[in-house]
Amino acid sequence: MNTSTKSYRRTKYACYYTYLAMSSIFSLPPLLFNTFHDRYGISYTLLGTLVLINFCTQLTVDLIFTFFTKYFNPHKTLRMMPCLTTLGLLVYAAIPTLFPQMAYIGFVAGTVIFSIAAGLCEVFLSPTVAALPSEHPERDMSMLHSLYGWGVLTVVVISTAFLRIFGTEYWMILTAFWALLPIGSCVLFCTSPLPAMNLTAQSESAAHAKRQNLGLALCVVCIFLGSAAENAMTNWISGYMETALHLPKVVGDILGMAAFAMLLVTARMLYAKYGKNITTVLLYSMIGAVLCYLIAALSPWVAVSMIACVLTGFVTSMLWPGTLILMEEKIPNPGVTAYALMAAGGDCGASVAPQLLGIVTDNVAASTWASDLAVSLSLTPDEIGMKVGMITAAVFPMIGIGAILFIKRYFAKNS
């Protein structure tokens, strides 16, 4: 390890810790939705709208930094980001506690604030890690994204234990606790050297810039498809196991969601230690995702379907970070703008796929042909709908296989 690498070790750890601490933004609110419904009388529709607000805010931040990157100081923004997370979570907890009649306004305000921080996290943490001197930058990127999964598991376990031991009436104390963790990120970033980051890609000529832009567009398509393949199962694994496989909810949550997350984290850490040949990894990941979705939907054996659902976490684990690694390999010094655009593509995939799966499931379950098929197969229309939804989700990695093959040919031709 050279001197330059050593001097930035603290910076790398700051990025790792920040990704870990930021996971509370995504995993804590859903754990509290039932509490908010019972204590404040907020409908599930309005609570679900908070998830949409979270996504739309992050996407807005991604797009702002895609088109207006030059107006922002990346180092100041990076140091301010954890403070926004803390502020958002404190607002999320304080306004409903102090003004119960304004609870939903507090939840919306807090969600907007910490979602801005989440968007900034997506835009700036990856290029910061990529800009650090390293002997294995692709492994550092994989490790960064694996820590998000560990963060989710940690938040779920600690929060569930807290609410069970102390009661849901103290949810605001739990939220305040998670709000304190990002302060450590702020301290680390303020006391660590930050690398210079290109705001936009540097091109030698107009023709070269055109090739880079097309290559970046292909990477955005790839991360959209990869994110869709991962998040369709992430959002539906528990419901699918409960409705289509008739497993108890606790099994769907523990053996489903938790095992899915654990395999996702494990695969990313394995790549962080041993990884290479990212294009091949992405190709086999897409193929594996197609097989897992089809087996989960079509297998007549519950155990096989359950294993396929869980294994989706392993095979899709590298599709998001792996596409970032691919972009960094093929487009040197891509700039913060490129990372913002990639984050926007990933966020779109994370939103579109679960929504499409839900729409397909509802429409198929309500159809006449599904009712007739359900009778002949001794299933319910809802089961048929869920299985068709899973088959539909397999379309994303199917297209992804073609996209990866095209990307491989494109960069081989234009390298």
Mark where each language-model region is:
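C-terminal ends and interior cores of transmembrane alpha-helices
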Residues: C83-Q101, G288-P300
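Helix-loop-helix hairpin linking two adjacent transmembrane segments in secondary transporters
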Residues: E135-H136, M143-M197
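Symmetry-related core transmembrane helices of the 12-TM Major Facilitator Superfamily/SLC fold
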Residues: M172-C190, K387-F406
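C-terminal transmembrane helical hairpin of 12-TM major facilitator-type secondary transporters
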Residues: I278-L326
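Extracytoplasmic gate region of multi-pass secondary transporters
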Residues: P29-L31, Q212-T266
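Helix-to-loop junctions at the C-terminal end of transmembrane segments
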Residues: V61-K76, L163, T266-T279, T361
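Cytoplasmic helix-loop-helix junction between adjacent transmembrane helices
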Residues: G110-S146
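Intracellular juxtamembrane helix-capping segments at the cytosolic ends
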Residues: L120-P133, M318-P332
